[in-house]
Amino acid sequence: MSQEFLARILEQKAREVEQMKLEQIQPLRQTYRLAEFLKNHQDCLQVIAEVKKASPSLGDINLDVDIVQQAQTYEENGAVMISVLTDEVFFKGHLDYLREISSQVEIPTLNKDFIIDEKQIIRARNAGATVILLIVAALSEERLKELYDYATELGLEVLVETHNLAELEVAHRLGAEIIGVNNRNLTTFEVDLQTSVDLAPYFEEGRYYISESAIFTGQDAERLAPYFNGILVGTALMQAENVAQRIKELQIDKG
């Protein structure tokens, strides 16, 4: 995902937001708090399992998947949260996927999208998300804080995504409780787990860290387990012949 590509996505999002209606705020779906769960379950590397039909880097991944069944399989096998892609243009997702999955599982759901406006946050909450994604690279620090504060005031938790030390420092200044490190390089589109390992020395006590992207095997998970509370895994689970077995391989015992 080059910066040019990120810019294309954000231009598309701006067009979508312009046409988007401001929804009335509906009651927040009840489930456990992700940060609290991570705090109380640090003896295991937790898996955030993603429902993703396609991506710009890989193209179609699994277009025929029964999204609700996939999500329920994740839940049954101990996923801590389900991440749902809702971007239609670049990831072939849909807000309805979030709504359907959130109505059929009891664990938290994450709205995985490029959020740049309060209207998107309300839509996510109304569709059943209890956590949203905010990407440091997509927002000014001032705008990031505005959206973070707005989401938390609505009772949502926020996964703040970073890619390098400068962005990690922004997340720390923000006071983010749950911080993601995306292993995808925004300028080359390459992925490297070393990104997560290199940032680990800068992690702070009292926060919870999630490694995202390029995590496929138990070996990958073992490499990250000493530093992270959880991992976000999409493609490996969407392509797995045995989803339950793959999740178990990724749930590294840290005890």
From Swiss-Prot:
Pathway: Amino-acid biosynthesis; L-tryptophan biosynthesis; L-tryptophan from chorismate: step 4/5. Its EC number is 4.1.1.48. It catalyses: 1-(2-carboxyphenylamino)-1-deoxy-D-ribulose 5-phosphate + H(+) = (1S,2R)-1-C-(indol-3-yl)glycerol 3-phosphate + CO2 + H2O. It comes from the Bacteria. Keywords: Amino-acid biosynthesis, Aromatic amino acid biosynthesis, Decarboxylase, Lyase, Tryptophan biosynthesis. CDD domains: IGPS. One of its GO terms (biological process) is L-tryptophan biosynthetic process. It is an enzyme of class 4 (lyase). HAMAP family: IGPS_B. This is Indole-3-glycerol phosphate synthase. It comes from Streptococcus pneumoniae (strain Taiwan19F-14).
